């Protein structure tokens, strides 16, 4: 469950006060032009003292609206798939699948905003343009496990270059993307998932 909570910080991770409205709109416009995105990623996690605690790698696929496939292949094999309605998290080592409503994830992490156009969700966060991209932080009163999300775009319309997530404990997760394919058709099956036979299923999609 700890691995799932950590992943939700990121995925369920990418909104604005009036003073930052222009920056928020600029980020939304840039994300809106990203109809689909597929890449490999390398991950580095450091604690609040700056000490490395984990390194990993995997693949990511995003498609408008609200479709995500995130597979970590090292050090553990885990899969996170959202078809826009339901979200599936598969931990192959634990042989467990967790099923959630995608809409419930948006309130806890700004990452889902990468594929969301819902103004009500964006209003929960402040966006500030930086020298390297954009910084997203939850507004006061918004319950989020993410303290800050920094987004860097690649040049020449090559999509995302880097995401850096800082959680409430001060832990920092950095994701660097490479071999990206931008705005190319992705098969619908990319965002579909059928639990393997014999695995434990924890279905939280009905709010139980």
Curated annotation (Swiss-Prot):
Pfam family for this entry, one: LolA
One Gene Ontology biological process: lipoprotein transport
InterPro entries: LolA/LolB/LppX, OM_lipoprot_carrier_LolA-like, OM_lipoprot_carrier_LolA_Pbac
Keyword Signal recorded: yes
Signal peptide feature range: 1-21
Segments for region (Disordered): 188-208
GO CC annotations, alphabetized: outer membrane-bounded periplasmic space
Keyword annotations from UniProtKB, A to Z: Chaperone, Periplasm, Protein transport, Signal, Transport
Database matches in Gene3D superfamilies: Lipoprotein localisation LolA/LolB/LppX (2.50.20.10)
NCBIfam families according to UniProt: lolA
Entry function: Participates in the translocation of lipoproteins from the inner membrane to the outer membrane. Only forms a complex with a lipoprotein if the residue after the N-terminal Cys is not an aspartate (The Asp acts as a targeting signal to indicate that the lipoprotein should stay in the inner membrane).
Assembly notes: Monomer.
Name the record gives this protein: Outer-membrane lipoprotein carrier protein
Organism listed in the record: Pseudoalteromonas translucida (strain TAC 125)
Gene encoding the protein: lolA
